Amino acid sequence: MRLAPIKLVVNYYVLFGKSLNQEKENLIEMKGVITQCLSNGMFRVKLENGFKVIAHISGKIRRNFIRILLGDSVIVELSPYDLTRGRIIYRLKPTNSSTETLRFNTNLK
């Protein structure tokens, strides 16, 4: 009797052709720089293509207590349905010799 719910879940994925990782395939990942720190783990991020988005911290970054500060370079995950909001999934290590980082930091606003 306990196998019936598991069988229903498996049949659902077989019938509708959905997998657990299928939703992650549609996401867009872009580099950006933190321009403003908002409340509750929200940040305003300027992407390398010039767009500005509001992004929140992913769960893994919260659990590992990774600090994200103003001017940090990050990777933001965007949904194709709403390109104004995103999730910060990685903080890039700072490099002093990178001219790209300096260019981003001078144009924060």
UniProtKB/Swiss-Prot annotation:
Keywords: Chloroplast, Initiation factor, Plastid, Protein biosynthesis, RNA-binding, rRNA-binding. It comes from the Eukaryota. InterPro entries: NA-bd_OB-fold, RNA-binding_domain_S1_IF1, S1_domain, TIF_eIF-1A, TIF_IF1. It is found in: Plastid, Chloroplast. Residues 18-93 form the S1-like domain. The keyword Magnesium does not apply. One of its GO terms (molecular function) is translation initiation factor activity. SMART domains: eIF1a, S1. GO terms for cellular component: chloroplast; cytosol. Component of the 30S ribosomal translation pre-initiation complex which assembles on the 30S ribosome in the order IF-2 and IF-3, IF-1 and N-formylmethionyl-tRNA(fMet); mRNA recruitment can occur at any time during PIC assembly. One of the essential components for the initiation of protein synthesis. Stabilizes the binding of IF-2 and IF-3 on the 30S subunit to which N-formylmethionyl-tRNA(fMet) subsequently binds. Helps modulate mRNA selection, yielding the 30S pre-initiation complex (PIC). Upon addition of the 50S ribosomal subunit IF-1, IF-2 and IF-3 are released leaving the mature 70S translation initiation complex. Belongs to the IF-1 family. This is Translation initiation factor IF-1, chloroplastic.
